[in-house]
């Protein structure tokens, strides 16, 4: 055995402790839709990077187009742009049994696609019993029937695909389960699948004046209770339109009251680089405005981007 002097040993220990004391820069992944007309995976990936994005929505591709799936995965990996999510926006609780079966099959296929392309998740809402608006309110959306049916749907989707990489996630909605972190925890425990994960959409969960005004506390509560399961997040903002009843309206990040300082700090603390994805804006200019605002808040907090 080689001799190690006391001085060398002490130097190593000091160096190790010093290394522990160094704080790694906080970084998050950030993205949004792009408006490129190209269908080429390489060009699409580079356009995300040109816009300063390190995360993307999955480009259009069919589950049976294996060549394009591989091309997308490889092109985006080369640019260090992760595919944050595959949207699976269908009503899993449609009152029409035929539509419900078709929607379940569609969402199952979207999870399979997410797994094949290397996306972080496939995401949907739990659905609604509303017969007219697929995501609309209904008195039974907080019922035991709704909860049990959602658990069954999530299990069916995950068990059919058996994903190796992607997760299946349900978004919060203000008028359906889960509408907050506690209902989300109940859902996680009931589904009882490792492939079931959390998709944070802060604005979707703000369904009262109290949550609107105390949204920083709501954000921190969501991450404190759900952080270990978070795989992706949505970015937008809310303003209160003054009427004779409560009316919140989605706006460009920075124009509303969402506490992005709290949001970005909680994201940066996660053990994984869960992407933050802007959505629901109308034009490239609005997305650019929202991105500038989010980056300015991050810069003030010392948070960087991949």
Which residues does each predicted region cover?
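Active-site acidic/histidine proton-transfer and metal-coordination neighborhood
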Residues: 13, 19-22, 78, 97-198
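Hydrophobic faces of well-ordered beta-strands that scaffold small-molecule active sites
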Residues: 28-33, 56-58, 83-88, 122-124, ...
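Acidic/histidine-rich catalytic cores of soluble enzymes
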Residues: 86, 155-257, 299, 305-306
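Conserved, mostly hydrophobic/aromatic
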Residues: 48, 56, 76, 103, ...
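N-terminal secretory signal peptides and thylakoid transit peptides that target proteins
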Residues: 1-17
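Acidic-and-aromatic substrate-binding clefts and catalytic sites of carbohydrate-active enzymes
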Residues: 34-42, 58-69, 91-95, 130-132, ...
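Acidic (Asp/Glu)-rich catalytic clusters
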Residues: 23-25, 43-50, 65-85, 111-118, ...
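C-terminal segment of N-terminal export signals and the immediately downstream linker at the start
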Residues: 20-39, 47
């Amino acid at each position: 055995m080689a001799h190690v002097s006391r001085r060398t040993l002490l130097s190593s220990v000091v160096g190790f402790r010093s290394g522990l004391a160094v704080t790694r820069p906080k970084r998050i992944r950030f993205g949004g839709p792009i408006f490129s007309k190209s269908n080429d995976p390489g060009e699409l990936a580079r356009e995300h990077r040109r816009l300063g994005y390190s995360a993307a929505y999955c480009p259009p591709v069919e589950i049976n187009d294996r060549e394009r799936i591989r091309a997308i995965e490889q092109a985006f990996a080369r640019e260090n742009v992760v595919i944050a999510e595959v949207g699976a926006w269908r009503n899993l609780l449609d009152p029409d049994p035929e539509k419900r079966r078709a929607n379940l099959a569609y969402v199952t296929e979207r999870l399979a696609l997410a797994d094949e392309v290397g996306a972080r998740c496939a995401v949907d809402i739990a659905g609604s019993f509303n017969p007219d608006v697929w995501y609309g309110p209904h008195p039974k959306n907080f019922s035991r029937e709704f909860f049990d049916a959602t658990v069954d749907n999530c299990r069916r989707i995950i068990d059919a695909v058996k994903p190796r990489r992607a997760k299946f996630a349900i978004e919060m909605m203000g008028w359906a389960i889960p509408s907050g972190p506690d209902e989300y925890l109940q859902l996680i425990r009931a589904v009882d699948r490792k492939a079931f994960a959390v998709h944070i959409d802060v604005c979707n969960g703000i369904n009262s004046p109290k949550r609107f005004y105390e949204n920083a506390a709501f954000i921190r509560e969501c991450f404190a209770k759900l952080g270990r399961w978070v795989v992706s997040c949505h970015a937008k903002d809310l303003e209160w339109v003054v009427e004779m009843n409560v009316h919140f309206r989605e706006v460009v990040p920075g124009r509303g009251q969402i506490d992005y300082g709290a949001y970005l700090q909680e994201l940066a603390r996660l053990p994984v680089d869960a992407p933050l994805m802007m959505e629901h804006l109308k034009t490239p200019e609005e997305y650019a405005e929202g991105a500038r605002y989010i980056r300015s808040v991050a810069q003030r907090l010392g948070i960087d981007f991949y």
